[in-house]
Amino acid sequence: SKAEIRKNPAYLFASIHYLLDTTRGKKITVMLPYSYRLKDVSDWFRQLWAESLGKKVDVDGNHVHLGQTPVNALGATDQHSQIQLYVEGPFDKLVCFLETEKFNADVTIPEGFEDHPGISYLSGHTMANLLMTEKSGTEHALVINHRPNMTIRLPEVNANSVGQLLYMLEVSTAFAGGLYRVNAFDQPGVEFGKQYAYAVMGKQGFEKKKAEFEQTKLPPRKVL
């Protein structure tokens, strides 16, 4: 809610995404929470960013066909499925970490397995410490390989902090719409498909759409 735009987190989030997309070719944005309780935030953000900013025309009516592709992931699970691509693959991604300073529950890794140095070094550490160390390692690997990334840190995961995060991301999406010069508050592409579905199912008032649908010649499809 800061008035000074350079200190406004919502505007900073939007401008970082916009500039890296339009000047550095970062066409994919990855949201990577290192807390299972924040997993649904990345799922929700994927929907928010995609349908708000993926547009064919801008506010002046120009055909622009723009929008970043949002990808959701989960740390540390996806270190073993996606991170290889982000660290060494195409230079087309921006990674946004989500982390929390405090976990509601934590477990200390017990002593044991002294004869197995590959795991015994973990004794005495907490699971939270292990998870956040994994995050730091991933972050470092991205930086060393010149992959842009950012971190949003919550004090803890509760209704207050998550509510603020969701609101910030919503405002940021509106800011991004202004930067891209598109309407971030409609989804004409979604409505286009819905209208054909209504027509085919016989909803009243969509007779013209049904005729249009039936007259459309689609290329033959092969079943593999």
Residues of each region from the PLM?
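Active-site phosphate/pyrophosphate-binding segments
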Residues: 1-96, 101-104, 189-224
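Solvent-exposed, flexible loop/coil residues
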Residues: 45, 57, 75, 90, ...
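Short alpha-helices
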Residues: 129, 133, 144-195, 202
